[in-house]
Amino acid sequence: MANNQAAKKRIEIAERNRLRNRTYKSALRTLMKRCFVACEAYSKEPGDAAKATVSASMNAAFSKIDKAVKVGVLHRNNGAHQKSRLSATVRQVLEPSS
């Protein structure tokens, strides 16, 4: 248990940040899952509407990742890794290698 006021305040701040980071990461994972689902839907039935959905979901996920890095929820290397993983999946679906 914390003995002084500063330590008690740091505990409160850490808990506040933990909750904020948890919601941010949850939203980020949701957007990434939506992008992966859109990729699967496009691979099953290719079309302009499905392609637009993939593109929109990828842009939303990229935006959320960039904001998470900016705020400090994610480390920039982790953000780059997530974006790379997402773009590789999208590239594989949209431009299948012959």
From Swiss-Prot:
Protein keywords: Ribonucleoprotein, Ribosomal protein, RNA-binding, rRNA-binding
Pfam families assigned: Ribosomal_S20p (PF01649)
Coiled coil spans: none
Gene Ontology biological process terms from the UniProt entry: translation
Function noted in UniProt: Binds directly to 16S ribosomal RNA.
Family in the record: Belongs to the bacterial ribosomal protein bS20 family.
NCBIfam families reported for this sequence: S20
UniProt protein name: Small ribosomal subunit protein bS20
